[in-house]
């Protein structure tokens, strides 16, 4: 009897702690997370190392969908699941996660682009529970496309630790997850989520959780109003938020570029705006260090030739055979802490269409850590394309990294694999996983230079502690196995 009670107690504790672990993915002071779908160069890290989710970004999508307790409001340009995901033994079944969320009572609303068989077929919607309300963007000469890549999780929750906004440049589509260069930005902030809900509700035409769209009130593109907040403070950093086309985003792109004191690094998929290209030349003539990665899709535009003439070898072009450089970011002063480093990113390509016709989102994060994370991705991509940067960020010393930042583990909760990322150099590092009874259940070695994958598929559902240690340092992190 005592044994049964003991096991029951531990089972209940596991369930309770699982909930707590799930709620604490974002630790105090760390409410902005960035991930990248292609390799990064952590040798230029100034503290925190960037995390690349190579062919695993779909798992991260699912992990955040599984966090939802009350609501999911999704604006996604393209959602496609196909057999290519089976190639790598990694089947991030986003549709199943959505349906499971709906089955457990999460109220879901979905806005997508009008189906375009070439660019946004949205075949993944065929697998979504038909009771989940979905609306498509309008068509017509005065409107472009619904190009956002946004998920708002528990945006209305009264608990300030619940609301999360998922954004960045990645569509929920096979190539975007497995092959293309994209960035993901995940922000846990109640006020920020409320601002994104205002935008969503304006397009939906109603505010009812999980309710049908009110087409009479629904507004897209140039028919929307500028009613969302534009400035937030998150983790002590200013974060700007803009929605196209009503917020004149190209103007804010120029303003952000012009705010640079020493350096601007650009990573843009589609660039047709010549005024932005000319500004690159103006800043370079003022002595600023300028560098750019541009996708081959932009070679059709005059702006590409302008940039090529201005930047010369400081611009590289991504000529992917079956992949894209799909980012739309700008890094301001990543190596100058006193200049106010910042990152601009989102769904907004640097085109007239994005500025005047499309539904897009853009954020500007004024934070040196975020700027350096993007710089690690930029640095790696620039060199992989044959370029050479003549100016580099100098890495900070190991003593400038806090213990809270030393080890990152994700996703939480996890099902089969746990990624362990070391932000400090640990010689002969090992890991040891313990269950709630203090029993050592898994052990292994860690590579300090890479993100490590730990197989936890054989563990029972519950809470565990992973202990990372070397000869003179030790760190512990708690995680939940679903």
Model features per residue range: what roles?
Residues 24-67, 78-256, 293-368:
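HKD-type phospholipase D/PLD-like phosphodiesterase module
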Residues 400-482:
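C-terminal outer-membrane/trafficking sorting elements
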Residues 1-25, 480:
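Bacterial Sec-dependent N-terminal signal peptides
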Residues 395-396:
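Short, compositionally biased serine/threonine- and acidic-rich segments at solvent-exposed termini, linkers
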Residues 254, 259-272, 276-277:
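Long, repeat-rich segments with strong aromatic
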Residues 73, 107-111, 265, 291-293, ...:
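A structural signal for isolated positions on well-ordered beta-strands in alpha/beta enzyme cores
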Residues 361, 365-384:
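Hydrophilic extracytoplasmic domains
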Residues 69, 74-80, 261, 266-268:
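Short acidic, glycine-rich surface-loop motifs adjacent to enzyme active sites
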């Amino acid at each position: 009897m005592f044994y049964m009670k003991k096991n029951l107690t531990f089972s209940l504790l596991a369930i309770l702690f699982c909930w707590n672990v799930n709620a604490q993915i974002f630790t105090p002071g760390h409410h902005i997370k960035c991930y990248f779908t292609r390799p990064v160069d952590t040798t230029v890290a100034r503290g925190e190392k960037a995390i690349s989710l190579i062919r695993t970004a779909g798992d991260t999508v699912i992990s955040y969908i599984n966090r939802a307790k009350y609501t999911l409001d999704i604006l996604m340009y393209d959602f496609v699941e196909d057999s290519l995901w089976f190639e790598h033994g990694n089947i991030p079944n986003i549709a199943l996660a959505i349906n499971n969320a709906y089955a457990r009572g999460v109220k879901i609303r979905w806005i997508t682009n009008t189906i375009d068989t070439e660019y946004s077929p949205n075949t993944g919607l065929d697998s979504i529970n038909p009771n989940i309300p979905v609306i498509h963007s309008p068509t017509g000469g005065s409107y472009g496309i619904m190009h956002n890549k946004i998920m708002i999780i528990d945006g209305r929750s009264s608990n300030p630790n619940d609301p999360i906004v998922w954004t960045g440049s990645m569509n929920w589509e096979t190539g975007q997850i497995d092959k293309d260069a994209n960035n993901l930005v995940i922000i846990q902030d109640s006020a920020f989520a409320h601002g994104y809900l205002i935008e969503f509700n304006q397009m939906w035409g109603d505010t009812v959780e999980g309710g049908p769209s009110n087409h009479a009130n629904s507004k897209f593109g140039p028919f929307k109003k500028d009613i969302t907040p534009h400035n937030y403070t998150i983790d002590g950093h200013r974060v700007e938020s803009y929605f196209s086309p009503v917020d004149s985003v190209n103007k804010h792109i120029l303003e952000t570029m012009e705010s640079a004191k020493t350096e601007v690094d650009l990573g843009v998929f589609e660039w047709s705006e010549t005024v932005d290209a000319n500004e690159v030349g103006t800043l370079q003539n003022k002595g600023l260090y300028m560098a750019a990665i541009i996708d081959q899709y932009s070679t059709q535009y005059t702006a590409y030739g302008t940039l090529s003439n201005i930047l010369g070898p400081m611009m590289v072009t991504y000529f992917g055979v079956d992949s894209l450089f799909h980012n739309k970011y700008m890094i301001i002063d990543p190596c100058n802490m006193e200049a106010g480093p910042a990152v601009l990113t989102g769904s907004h390509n640097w085109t007239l269409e994005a500025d005047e016709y499309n539904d897009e989102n853009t954020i500007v994060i004024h934070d040196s850590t975020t700027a350096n994370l993007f710089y690690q991705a930029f640095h790696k991509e620039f060199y992989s394309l044959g370029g050479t940067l003549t100016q580099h960020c100098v890495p900070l010393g190991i003593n400038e990294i806090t213990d809270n930042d030393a080890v990152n583990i994700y996703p939480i909760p996890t099902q089969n694999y746990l990624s362990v990322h070391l932000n400090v150099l640990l010689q002969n590092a090992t890991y040891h996983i313990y269950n709630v009874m203090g029993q050592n259940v898994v052990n292994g070695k860690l590579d300090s230079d890479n993100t490590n994958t730990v197989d936890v598929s054989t563990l029972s559902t519950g809470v565990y502690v992973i202990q990372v240690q070397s000869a003179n340092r030790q760190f512990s992190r708690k995680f939940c196995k679903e």
